[in-house]
Regions:
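Substrate-positioning beta->alpha
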Residues: 164, 204-229
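Glycine-rich NAD(P)-binding loop of the Rossmann-fold in SDR/ketoreductase-type enzymes
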Residues: 70, 98, 102-113, 156, ...
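Catalytic helix-loop patch of NAD(P)-dependent Rossmann-fold dehydrogenases
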Residues: 105, 137-181, 204-206
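Glycine/proline-rich active-site loop of Rossmann-fold NAD(P)-dependent oxidoreductases
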Residues: 167, 191-201, 226-240
Length: 386
């Protein structure tokens, strides 16, 4: 009888933005895996890449709306009839660094569109809105302030228009007057986006900067779980930090060595640490990220098991001579990273072109940059204390 009651219940409609990106696609997959509980309505830009992706996940319980989340009428169409709105989509770095005005317009505008569209519904109180924020809103947190929680001061880094856009977007959610809203502040997601590997952001992070990472699959489980009937009333109208737990606390150089290891490459051998920023990134360990998992129960993969499987998969690929031949070696990666640092917004670009405001933000001063020891001179790599 209980099972029949579940399967005979009308499915809930979940509107998802950003469903073609990492966290979004994992969320869509998780929701579709629970059919007939949910009908997923996904907004996607009509690019050739997105259309190919949608073909791979086509499902009777998936409705795709082609459009732009900056367009209010499109958002209204997607929100109408939805029980849940999961606003995962955003312009993120490094694209956000290149197009700051579009980033502000897209990220803030889409959030305001969703809030307005929910208020246009016959009963706005029946719509539950989950907004995805970011750890970048709290800005640079070097040792000894490398711990944080929701409630800490909002202080986005200089030149970080993505973070600034998310600050104003989250504030709009907090002040929306909606009955059901929540902000899920995302951290770095593993695996990292490959596209960022060719961008100056590679040098914007101090080697010893920390993040408490999340896995993409567990992020998707988190978002799907918040759509379940068993989520308590007290979950709503709060902000939460999302991570996959203390087993994912890494300094930047540690995480990169985990990723590079199967290729026989070390961070220390390919990055010129004298050109890596001292300040002005973001990230910290969390004192409160267990709170979200205590409610939504999304941490299902032991960190050690996940990393061991990822390493084994990469090592198996590297045993294929054709694949191995396409991968960089230490020399080629080092040369490429040097080229990247000279791109606009890169750290070498800042120094060579006397971009004093950028130098001040990322190094404090030109003198401080010149005092950074090289690896050969004894630069200290360490894991900040937990």
């Amino acid at each position: 009888p209980e099972y029949r009651a579940v399967i005979s219940k009308a499915p809930k409609t979940v509107f998802v933005t950003g469903g073609t990106r990492k966290m979004g696609i994992e969320t869509v997959k998780q929701l579709l895996a629970r059919k007939p509980k949910f009908v997923v309505r996904m907004l996607a830009r009509p690019s050739a890449k997105n259309k190919e992706l949608v073909k791979k996940i086509a499902d009777p319980y998936l409705e795709v709306v082609w459009g732009d989340m900056k367009d209010y009428e499109t958002i209204l169409k997607c929100v109408t009839g939805a029980d849940y709105v999961l606003h995962i989509g955003a312009m993120v770095s490094p694209a956000a660094d290149k197009y700051p005005e579009e980033t502000l317009y897209t990220n803030i505008g889409s959030t305001l569109n969703i809030i307005k569209a929910i208020k246009e519904q016959p009963d706005p109180d029946k719509v539950k809105f989950a907004y995805v924020g970011t750890v970048a809103m709290t800005g640079d947190r070097p040792v000894p302030v490398n711990w944080g929680r929701c409630g800490d001061p909002i202080n986005p880094s200089a030149h970080d228009y993505y973070a600034m856009s998310k600050v104003f977007s989250e504030l709009s959610v907090f002040d929306s007057g909606l009955k059901y809203w929540v902000s899920i502040r995302q951290t770095g997601q593993y695996p990292p986006d490959q596209g960022a590997g060719e961008e100056p952001i590679q040098h914007h992070q101090n080697p010893n900067n920390v993040l408490e990472w999340s896995t993409a699959v567990e992020s998707g489980i988190c978002m799907a779980n918040l759509c379940e009937d068993w989520v308590p009333e007290e979950f709503w109208r709060k902000a939460y930090n999302l991570s996959s737990g203390k087993g994912w606390r890494f300094a930047h150089w540690e995480l990169m060595n985990f990723s590079f290891g199967p290729m026989g490459i070390r961070y220390q051998d390919v990055f010129d640490v004298t050109k890596c920023a001292l300040y002005n990134f973001h990230g910290h360990y969390y004192t409160d990220s267990d709170l979200l998992d205590d409610i939504l129960h999304f941490r299902v993969i032991p960190p050690e098991s996940y990393r061991a499987e990822a390493t084994a998969e990469m090592e198996a690929m590297m045993k294929n001579p054709m694949i191995a031949a396409m991968m960089p070696n230490t020399r080629s990666m080092k040369e490429n990273l040097e080229k990247i640092s000279h791109k606009e917004m890169g750290t070498s670009w800042m120094l060579e072109n006397n971009q004093e405001d950028w130098i001040h933000a990322f190094f404090g001063s030109r003198e401080k940059q010149q005092q950074i020891k090289s690896v050969e001179e004894g630069y200290e790599f360490y894991h900040p204390s937990e």
